[in-house]
Amino acid sequence: MTDYRLQPTMNLWTTDDNASMMEAFMSSSDISTLWPPASTTTTTATTETTPTPAMEIPAQAGFNQETLQQRLQALIEGTHEGWTYAIFWQPSYDFSGASVLGWGDGYYKGEEDKANPRRRSSSPPFSTPADQEYRKKVLRELNSLISGGVAPSDDAVDEEVTDTEWFFLVSMTQSFACGAGLAGKAFATGNAVWVSGSDQLSGSGCERAKQGGVFGMHTIACIPSANGVVEVGSTEPIRQSSDLINKVRILFNFDGGAGDLSGLNWNLDPDQGENDPSMWINDPIGTPGSNEPGNGAPSSSSQLFSKSIQFENGSSSTITENPNLDPTPSPVHSQTQNPKFNNTFSRELNFSTSSSTLVKPRSGEILNFGDEGKRSSGNPDPSSYSGQTQFENKRKRSMVLNEDKVLSFGDKTAGESDHSDLEASVVKEVAVEKRPKKRGRKPANGREEPLNHVEAERQRREKLNQRFYALRAVVPNVSKMDKASLLGDAIAYINELKSKVVKTESEKLQIKNQLEEVKLELAGRKASASGGDMSSSCSSIKPVGMEIEVKIIGWDAMIRVESSKRNHPAARLMSALMDLELEVNHASMSVVNDLMIQQATVKMGFRIYTQEQLRASLISKIG
């Protein structure tokens, strides 16, 4: 899983330099016709710089970016259905105080069957070369924004951006009012909305569902939970599953003890729980007004409790959570007392923190653009945040390379200065558990991690066995099945082939010499025959003229030739028929004294002759 994050206060859609980013997502071919303007349903961006009410619902206990990513991944990786992506829609508020659902986080797995071509719709083509260049351009601009202004090379986005990947990326710009769209209906009614089939998607009345059908989606399901709505989509038609609905409602319930994940089976990499420092312990999450005097919120770290997440390999990790946090949304926030603070931490359409370089998302990678800013709004004093920032700069980021060659970044930001002692212990634990650098062979081309000697030896033996299998297939007679006998039989077979080649070459040379001798003998006979008394032979023999009769019936022709038997007239007739591309069905020959009579029945093929044309052609070739 690859985790992409930005600074929590960076807004990609409202800065002056990046104001065209929203248009980049929404101005592709026919996108404007399939998604109505955002003002009709939801509010996704703002350009106001004055202090505004807080837009995000206060973070609930146990809700943070790391566990949300793991929950989304475990949801679709742990099922036998072929889900393509999973998105968590997080409730928040617009400037009017109305509740809306916005992008919380997402996980893109990709299509199950990579051997088959990508599913495409018969609607207007979204995968033309021009559209592909446009998608790559938008993705490169997004990469440069996320990587802090460093423009990535063109090789970073060299593959095609598939329709499902583009649909997943464009989903970051979506938001839903309560009761609008599939996610809004699921959040308003509390019931799952399951739409399967391209016809049902186009007739669902939701523009996003129609767009998903255009991009090859066949199933979109929105399942409400206590803290938001989980949307899963697939390129295959999948029937409604009550097990998946129950799993979502348990897995994404962050309130109190209902969110305990110890009994769930997370179908993840077994080493991921041990290698990823972000899974060992999570920082406590602050709530609005938790540090203000008189609000009755305890500040002692003893009021925190931890929940255990059980993985398949038996390793566990803890998530620190405050049970006294109030999950109730609060549209009016005390941050309005400080305009500078509000401008820094007000949520518009922000991305989460990361310093990693972004590339095109592949199958099985988490594309994290969720909002992970853990904020403490109760203390308007900027000095506390500057101190917190200095502490965070001293913390080490842990970068772990899992066994499946997926790069994972773990970076935590604290929400309260009261828990600095807890954070310090976390930093020490991360530093102690850092994996040592492996010593082994240098990585080959395209390999991210060098192989150790055990893996290299295993691959060498597999390659050697494959070659022995190929050798056994070409050797005809194998005495025994062991490798030594196989090599001996192969050597004997090769020597036998060599002897056959030598013998064949000698026979070829012998036949060539015999042919030369026959040619010399024929030349001598012709010379002796021509040196005789030609006048006496000509006077004694009466020349016989040549007569050719031809009859054509449809595609067949009957040929009768009367000529002298000298100079092989039968061979000349057959040669003429071959040159004229005539197929011989029947032929006969008889000799009376010096007269030879030939009869042949032939069939015309590609060339069609008349009776006169065929007779003239035969006379020119035989006579």
UniProtKB/Swiss-Prot annotation:
Compartments, as annotated in UniProt: Nucleus
Superkingdom of origin: Eukaryota
Annotated GO CC locations: nucleus
Ranges of compositional bias, category Low complexity: 299-308
PROSITE patterns, alphabetized: BHLH
Record has Manganese as a keyword: no
bHLH domain: residues covered: 448-497
Compositionally biased region (Polar residues): 309-358, 376-391
CDD domains (UniProt xref): bHLH_AtAIB_like
Effect of T328A: Jasmonate-insensitive phenotype and increased stability of the protein
Reported modifications of this chain: The phosphorylation at Thr-328 is increased by methyl jasmonate treatment, facilitates the proteolysis of the protein and is coupled to transcriptional activity. The phosphorylation at Ser-563 by KIN10 represses its activity in the regulation of ABA-inducible genes.
SMART domains referenced in this protein's UniProt entry, alphabetically: HLH
GO biological process: abscisic acid-activated signaling pathway; extracellular ATP signaling; indole glucosinolate biosynthetic process; L-tryptophan metabolic process; positive regulation of DNA-templated transcription; positive regulation of flavonoid biosynthetic process; protein homotetramerization; regulation of defense response to insect
Regulation of its activity: Down-regulated by KIN10 that controls its protein stability under a phosphorylation-dependent manner.
Keywords annotated in UniProt: Abscisic acid signaling pathway, Activator, DNA-binding, Host-virus interaction, Jasmonic acid signaling pathway, Nucleus, Phosphoprotein, Transcription, Transcription regulation
Modified residues (Phosphothreonine): T328
GO terms assigned for molecular function: DNA binding; DNA-binding transcription factor activity; kinase binding; protein dimerization activity; sequence-specific DNA binding; transcription cis-regulatory region binding
Residues bearing PTM Phosphoserine: S563
Induction, per UniProt: Detected early after abscisic acid (ABA) treatment or after dehydration and high-salt stresses. Induced by UV treatment. Up-regulated by methyl jasmonate and herbivory.
Residue span of region Disordered: 111-133, 265-399
Domains as described in the record: The transcriptional activation domain (TAD) (149-188) overlaps with the destruction element (DE) (154-165).
Protein name: Transcription factor MYC2
Source organism (scientific name): Arabidopsis thaliana
